[in-house]
Design a protein with these regions (language model features):
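Active-site rim helix/loop that mediates acceptor-substrate recognition in acyltransferases
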Residues: 32-86
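Conserved acetyl-CoA pyrophosphate-binding loop and the N-cap/start of the following alpha-helix
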Residues: 114, 118-126
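Conserved GNAT acetyl-CoA-binding A-motif
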Residues: 131-141
Length: 141
């Protein structure tokens, strides 16, 4: 009989790391497109285009690296990486509503070849933990 030990908490998964906007935006955009293109509307296509354009704009990336709590692009979040390839993503989009800090968890995506392993669940949990640690009054999915 064989068994596998799974970490009890999401933060114990070595494949999970924080999104690095300086290098991950194009790959995350590709993953989102792969996972959602059959149902993506014009707003979604525009969002992907904005992500890709932002990833090529050095001035924006330098600015955004310090503004992760105030913009709607996914400048913070978590990715799942295997063999130096991003195969999962959960973006965190912070905003304020009547002075309250709120996080939207968006673009939870897992590459089709890596599904049914709990990657999306673990990334979502990590994103929720992040929002909780930032004292968010609400988390929306």
């Amino acid at each position: 009989m064989s068994s596998i030990t799974l970490p009890a908490k999401a933060k114990e998964h070595p494949q999970v790391r924080t999104l690095n906007i300086l290098r991950d935006l194009p790959t995350v955009a590709d993953l989102i497109e792969l996972c959602f293109s059959p149902t993506m509307d014009q707003d979604g296509q525009r969002y992907l285009s904005d992500m890709r354009r932002a990833s090529r704009d050095d001035k924006f990336l330098r600015w955004a690296n310090h503004m992760t709590e105030t913009t709607s692009l996914p400048l913070t979040g978590y990715v799942w990486e295997e063999n130096n390839k991003i195969v999962g993503n959960a973006s965190l989009i912070p905003f304020r509503d009547n002075g309250k800090r709120i996080y939207l968890i968006a673009n939870v995506a897992t590459h089709p070849d890596h599904r049914r392993r709990g990657i999306g669940r673990i990334l979502t949990q990590r994103a929720m933990d992040h929002a909780r640690n930032k004292k968010a009054s609400a988390v929306w999915l």
